[in-house]
């Protein structure tokens, strides 16, 4: 077997050592070594960058390939010591010539980081004698194409709480004939027994044998020129040459693109010109030169020269890269943010949340508890958790894996629960319009007064794609009471003046625009239209207007006959101007649609109420093949609104068959979600992406839409595996439904990558064409259609756009063709039936037939927030700006069927969503959402049937019709997207032009990034994204760009992004690792990361099968922590506003250090948070005293602490463990504490026995506590068991329950675990238990206690109760058996504490 020597270099930088909480002063040293699997023959060497020969204690040195940092002394707590050592590990590997790339990807590289300590400085130089006190091992997941560029803060163990900041850069730098001898692993090495020295040395193979294969015999001199090399040998040589050159070229491109991105995003770096080696061109040139040679020796020599030439380029670039980025503080900051975001995103897996009505807290939710227990078991055994990929550089001890991470369920009790993706801080709205009025979205001045006398929440707003900047902390009105007038500032500004500008631009990658020159935020003319231009749309453009945008304007008059109905209507007119009008980025300006939406508040909208002012189209200037497709929406009064079902229709009408089938396999539809509020003290929350992976609409107490069984509908015309395989999302429409239809329509879904096995034949390079220019159907046809369909609400959608992967601001075209669709299919008229109202009949969207054009079948976008996709078609996602209103979503209602599992192969003659297919069956499911119901307003977007004509063109029809000021477009289809050429950005941005909303918005994000490919440089100005970049440059989507979206800290509330389309950082990481694939793994045939893909599919499958009642934090755009530990520049604390005092109280037989880790992770997670921790120690000597005594001690301690340090207190929070929680509650009732009651903020109860230990289900623990009480004469244990008084109502705990306290907190967070047998689970959660229900003597007293405790909480307006149910991954030990392990895991499990605080818990202390 021919073998090749590959050289990989790792640059490891040790930046800073942080003393978090070390116990011992003295001398410390970090030692780092790289370990490579002994199964692969290798040679390892290490060198320190820029080191001279002299070595001293105060400089780094190398011993046997282990790097010793300089020795440093630690004297103070919170001390930061700059290390600034950089080392290069060079690994020469002997690789099989057949699968070099795979072999390199599978090498197990590990970086071992050890902490050594001694009192004697000199002892640390004694390599053998200096003791190692703690060690961590980092797994480095290296991929030869992308290299590895990552930063990890490595935290040592509990007893040595300190962090060393480590940056790793790695690249494949050489491939060549083996030049050094390698030691073969000996027998038994696969068992770990064989060391590197046990095997034999490998003899070096001759170059010819390497090139031509083992079967090659060198001709003797006598044969001379008559010797002819066999065809097999020649083929072997050419293939070998091609594979090696291709791998080196990819490695070069990956490093170069990463370098370019770094230079672009970090202005402080010196900008240098980097030589570009175009992969295909260079490869074809090298191969063609080799083809011309016939002499075997010359062929071998030429191959060697080519490899040496490419290697020299690679080495030059690598050296240049290291010289630029090594130990550069800005690069470190950039990579730190990226790592933190991915890590938090990974922690958010298997973390569920659900919202309930506040009153539900008083009920016995036995089913909920049982569901949690069953789910935790299912998750542990599910492929979802077991297939979760690792981080690019991970440490199992601190990052965990599926086997060690806890599973957490959160139940939040709020006034207006949302069963959708909204956060509790963005509650539901009632938005009926008070009087008949024309809602002209153009009128900025009008504030829309909302009369919420109905329980329906409605939005009359069409969202725009780019959420303008919004102050994420601004007030959002919570569920107005009936009869209350509400004028929502920005929300209704949206409503009153939101002009929806959708400009669909065409992007073409010109040869002159290199991959790295994606536009960086400056707005080009194309696609940006100021408000002033709106009125010009009233005139029909003449032939000379070829370059002017066409605005389609629709007024919908509303009447107030039935205020519970409001129809959003959307008109899009997508037009292309002549190709000559492209700007420097190759953009076509396309027509804009100006939509004026009015709420029609009657059961039926008649056509006379809606005037289609203009559906003007460009007469000239359209591509010769291009035709405009006008989607018109027809609203017919009088039919009851059945849940829509969208189906593909073949020439023969399938509608009738759908009538019967639609109820069978309905999937729940998803709802839109509201904007996230950052830093709010309430956890942001949103929904599971596919569950109803959706954008939660403001309109959301929605009824479920249902699709007919996709199987029945899809079989006739859907290609079975293409989309399913291709979809990063596992192919369910649910994810697509996640977007309001139009939204999806104008975005690319990542839908076109073929998956490995059955799609190999689809050349990935063809995928690049997925965004090529579509043809637009003729304006004449479109206009005719619009006229013939005098619809009540015109619905014109941009259905086609020219697009390649380069985009201009203002363009919302990200098209992604489906590689599996047939070329050149004609698309006949497509009709989509739309139910606009509960009482209304269908409307039709007509798509005139266009020759050889394609459009994406778009799902219905229901104002109630759910999108419905036509089965069998992909949908594209678009980010829309939505009034900040929240939607409800039925957890049971699933977003659509696996309609997307398959890609349309040929377009059916008719796309129809027939009204006959509608049924009421979905309504009942959703009505249980709340007492409110939302009218079923559905705004169907055009069916997106995707077909590709011969040029791979594709168009989209989309109608963003959303109602949420910052919708997350939840769950955009995360299908592997088609690769866009040249790695340029394909942004989606529309300009929403309401200045009033703009001024209050902090968000810059407006793009919907599907998978990882779309970054709107315009929406995210690059300078604001130093730390984390949205995915840019790469439009390729390797599967790792999945739902692990990340949010740059500068844009904390990325409304407008669903989890699936939130910003992805540029991770530049190996394909198999968790997170997003590098931006530069851009455009050609990047392989899909099967591991990430399978994880995503497993996750979707898990959510589907289990019908999860609740949602995953991983589907949220913004999590609790967006700032990494140890940010480079902490804001100076301004103590004028007062500090936040956090009092930590330990439990029985505990001490002040018990809550040390809790304190540590809050401090690390909230740098500059003005937090002052009081670790209570007054009771640590005697926790067996009675509660009154301990209460007095704690109260004295708190008041003394405040007075001693003269603290100006703004807020007080309490964190208690076990029995400490009772002491805290007792303190709240004391008169001396009354002054501080109005400052109470958060009460975090960790396994607190609030109801005592009366109904403990562990006999062993009960017996132990009884014995301990007898031995210690413990008053507290007596009181916990209600034996301190014969009359239960005179017991301490009962009387404590009657006193006020908990309702003064903003957040009451109860953490409990069924595995904890020290404290009964129901007691920690303050809820009823089965045994108490059966107990006629004590049960009623127990119930009274619960009501006494929770009643004031329910009545308190500003108090939120949150319960957490934690399932730890515990080893089988005696501690686990008796329940102690879980009881103390909330204190000493780093994995639980980091997961809890980073994902959700930090919000309670902000």
UniProtKB/Swiss-Prot annotation:
Domain of life of the organism encoding this protein: Eukaryota
Cross-referenced SUPFAM superfamilies: alpha/beta-Hydrolases (SSF53474)
Modified residues (Phosphoserine): 777-778
GO BP terms, alphabetized: lipid metabolic process
Species the sequence originates in: Homo sapiens
Native organism taxonomy: Eukaryota, Metazoa, Chordata, Craniata, Vertebrata
InterPro entries documented for this protein: AB_hydrolase_fold (IPR029058), DUF3657 (IPR022122), DUF676_lipase-like (IPR007751), Lipase-like (IPR044294)
Name the record gives this protein: Protein FAM135B
A matching Pfam family: DUF3657
Keywords: Phosphoprotein
Cytoplasm listed as a keyword: no
């Amino acid at each position: 077997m021919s073998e090749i020597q590959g050289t990989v270099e790792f640059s490891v930088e040790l930046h800073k050592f942080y003393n978090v909480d070390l116990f011992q002063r003295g001398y410390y040293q970090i030692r780092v070594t790289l370990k490579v699997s002994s199964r692969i023959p290798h040679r390892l060497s290490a060198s320190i960058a820029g080191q001279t020969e002299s070595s001293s204690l105060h400089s780094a040195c190398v011993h046997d390939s282990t790097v010793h940092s300089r020795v440093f002394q630690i004297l103070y707590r919170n001390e930061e010591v700059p290390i600034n050592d950089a080392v290069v590990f060079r690994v020469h590997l002997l690789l099989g010539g057949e699968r070099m790339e795979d072999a390199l990807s599978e090498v197990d590289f590990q970086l071992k980081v050890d902490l050594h300590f001694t009192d004697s400085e000199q002892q640390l130089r004694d390599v053998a004698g200096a003791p190692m006190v703690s060690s961590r091992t980092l797994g480095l997941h290296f991929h030869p194409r992308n290299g590895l560029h990552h930063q990890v803060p490595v935290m040592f163990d509990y007893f040595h709480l300190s962090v060393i900041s480590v940056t790793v850069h790695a690249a494949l730098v050489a491939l060549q004939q083996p030049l050094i001898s390698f030691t073969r692993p000996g027998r038994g090495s696969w068992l770990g027994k064989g060391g590197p020295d046990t095997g034999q040395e490998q003899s070096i193979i001759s170059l010819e044998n390497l090139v031509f294969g083992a079967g090659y015999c060198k001709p003797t001199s006598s044969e001379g020129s008559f010797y002819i090399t066999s065809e097999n040998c020649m083929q072997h040589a050419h293939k070998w040459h091609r594979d090696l050159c291709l791998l080196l070229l990819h490695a070069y491109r990956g490093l170069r693109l990463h370098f370019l991105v770094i230079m672009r995003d970090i202005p402080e770096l010196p900008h240098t010109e980097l030589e570009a080696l175009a992969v295909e061109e260079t490869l074809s040139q090298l191969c063609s030169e080799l083809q011309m040679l016939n002499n075997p020796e010359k062929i071998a020599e030429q191959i060697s020269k080519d490899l040496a030439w490419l290697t020299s380029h690679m080495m030059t670039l690598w050296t240049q890269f290291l010289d630029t980025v090594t130990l550069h503080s800005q690069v470190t900051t950039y990579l730190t943010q990226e790592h933190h975001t991915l890590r938090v995103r990974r922690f958010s897996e298997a973390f569920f949340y659900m919202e309930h009505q506040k009153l539900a807290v008083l009920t016995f939710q036995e089913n909920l508890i049982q569901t949690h227990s069953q789910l935790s078991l299912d998750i542990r055994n599910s492929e979802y958790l077991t297939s979760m990929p690792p981080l690019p550089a991970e440490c199992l001890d601190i990052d965990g894996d599926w086997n060690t991470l806890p599973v957490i369920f959160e139940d939040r009790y709020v006034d207006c629960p949302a069963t959708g993706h909204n956060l509790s801080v963005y509650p539901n709205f009632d938005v009926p319009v008070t009087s008949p009025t024309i809602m002209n979205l153009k009128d900025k001045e009008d504030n829309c007064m909302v009369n919420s006398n109905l329980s329906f929440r409605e939005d009359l707003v069409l969202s725009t794609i780019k959420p303008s900047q919004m102050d994420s902390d601004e007030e959002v009105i919570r569920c107005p009471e009936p009869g209350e007038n509400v004028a929502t500032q920005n929300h209704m500004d949206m409503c009153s003046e939101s002009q929806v500008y959708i400009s669909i631009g065409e992007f073409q990658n010109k040869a002159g625009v290199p991959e790295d020159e994606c536009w960086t935020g400056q707005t080009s003319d194309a696609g940006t239209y100021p408000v002033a231009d709106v009125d010009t749309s009233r005139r029909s453009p003449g032939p000379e207007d070829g370059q002017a945008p066409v605005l389609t304007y629709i007024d919908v008059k509303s009447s107030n006959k039935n205020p519970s109905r409001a129809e959003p209507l959307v008109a899009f007119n997508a037009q292309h101007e002549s190709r000559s009008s492209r700007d420097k980025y190759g953009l076509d300006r396309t027509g804009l649609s100006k939509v004026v939406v009015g709420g029609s508040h009657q059961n039926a909208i008649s056509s006379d109420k809606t005037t289609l002012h203009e559906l003007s189209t460009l007469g000239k200037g359209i591509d010769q093949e291009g035709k405009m497709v006008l989607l018109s929406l027809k609203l017919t009064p009088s039919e009851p609104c059945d849940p829509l079902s969208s189906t593909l229709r073949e020439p023969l009408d399938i509608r009738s068959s759908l009538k019967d089938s639609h109820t069978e396999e309905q999937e729940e539809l998803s709802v839109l979600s509201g904007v996230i509020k950052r830093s709010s003290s309430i956890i942001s929350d949103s929904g599971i992406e596919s569950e109803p992976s959706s954008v939660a609409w403001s309109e959301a107490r929605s009824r479920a839409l249902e699709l007919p069984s996709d199987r029945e509908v899809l079989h006739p015309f859907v290609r079975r595996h293409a989309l399913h395989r291709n979809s990063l999302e596992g192919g369910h429409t649910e994810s697509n439904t996640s977007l309001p239809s139009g939204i999806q329509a104008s975005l690319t879904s990542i839908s076109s990558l073929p998956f490995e096995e059955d799609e190999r034949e689809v050349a990935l390079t063809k995928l690049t064409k997925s965004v090529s220019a579509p043809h637009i159907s003729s304006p004449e046809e479109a206009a005719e259609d619009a006229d013939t369909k005098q619809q009540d609400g015109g619905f014109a959608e941009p259905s086609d756009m020219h697009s390649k992967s380069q985009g201009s601001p203002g363009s919302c075209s990200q098209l992604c063709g489906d590689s599996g669709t047939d070329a050149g299919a004609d698309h006949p008229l497509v009709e989509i039936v739309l139910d606009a109202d509960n009482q209304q009949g269908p409307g039709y969207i007509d798509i005139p037939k266009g020759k050889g054009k394609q459009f994406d079948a778009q799902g219905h976008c229901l104002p109630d927030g759910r999108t419905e996709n036509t089965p069998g078609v992909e949908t594209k996602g678009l980010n829309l700006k939505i009034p900040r209103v929240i939607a409800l979503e039925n957890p049971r209602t699933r977003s659509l069927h696996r309609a997307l599992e398959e890609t349309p192969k040929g377009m059916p003659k008719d796309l129809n969503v027939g009204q006959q297919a509608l049924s009421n069956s979905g309504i009942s499911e959703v009505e249980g959402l709340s007492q409110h119901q939302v009218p079923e307003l559905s705004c169907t977007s055009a069916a997106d049937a995707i077909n590709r004509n011969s040029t791979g063109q594709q168009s989209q029809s989309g109608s963003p019709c959303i109602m949420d000021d910052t919708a997350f477009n939840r769950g955009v289809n995360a299908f592997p997207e088609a690769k866009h050429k040249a790695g340029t950005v394909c942004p989606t941005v529309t300009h929403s032009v309401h200045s009033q909303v703009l001024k209050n918005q902090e968000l810059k994000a407006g793009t919907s990034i599907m998978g990882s490919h779309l970054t709107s440089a315009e929406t995210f100005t690059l300078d604001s994204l130093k730390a984390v970049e949205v995915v840019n440059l790469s439009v390729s989507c390797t599967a790792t760009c999945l739902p692990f979206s990340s949010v740059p800290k500068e844009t904390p509330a990325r409304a407008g992004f669903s989890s699936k389309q939130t910003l992805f950082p540029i991770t530049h990481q190996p394909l198999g690792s968790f997170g997003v694939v590098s931006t530069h793994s851009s455009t050609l045939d990047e392989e899909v990361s099967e591991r990430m893909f399978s994880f995503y599919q497993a996750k979707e499958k898990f959510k589907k099968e289990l019908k999860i009642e609740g949602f995953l934090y991983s589907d949220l755009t913004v999590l609790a922590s967006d700032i990494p530990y140890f940010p480079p520049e902490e804001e100076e604390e301004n103590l004028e506003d007062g500090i936040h005092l956090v009092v930590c109280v330990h439990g029985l037989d505990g001490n002040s250090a018990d809550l040390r880790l809790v304190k540590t992770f809050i401090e690390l997670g909230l740098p500059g948070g003005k937090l002052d921790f009081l670790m209570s120690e007054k009771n640590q000597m005697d926790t067996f005293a009675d509660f009154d005594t301990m209460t007095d001690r704690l109260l004295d301690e708190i008041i003394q602490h405040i007075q001693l340090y003269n603290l100006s207190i703004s807020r007080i929070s309490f964190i208690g463990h076990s029995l400490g929680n009772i002491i805290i509650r007792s303190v709240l009732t004391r008169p001396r504490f009354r002054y501080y009651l109005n400052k109470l903020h958060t009460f975090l109860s960790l396994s607190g026995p609030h109801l005592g230990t009366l109904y403990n289900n562990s006999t062993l623990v009960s017996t132990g506590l009884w014995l301990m009480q007898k031995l210690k004469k413990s008053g507290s244990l007596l009181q916990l068991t209600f034996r301190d008084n014969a009359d239960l109502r005179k017991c301490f705990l009962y009387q404590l329950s009657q006193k006020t306290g908990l309702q003064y907190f903003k957040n009451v967070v109860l953490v409990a675990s069924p595995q904890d047998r020290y404290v009964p689970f129901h007691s920690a959660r303050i809820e009823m238990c089965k045994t108490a229900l059966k107990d006629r003597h004590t049960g009623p007293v127990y119930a009274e206690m619960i009501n006494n405790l929770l009643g004031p909480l329910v009545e308190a307006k500003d108090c939120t109760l949150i319960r957490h149910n934690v399932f730890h991954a515990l080893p089988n030990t005696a501690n686990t058996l008796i329940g102690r392990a879980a009881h103390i895991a909330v204190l000493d499990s780093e994995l639980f504490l980091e997961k809890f605080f980073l994902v959700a818990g930090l919000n309670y202390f902000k």
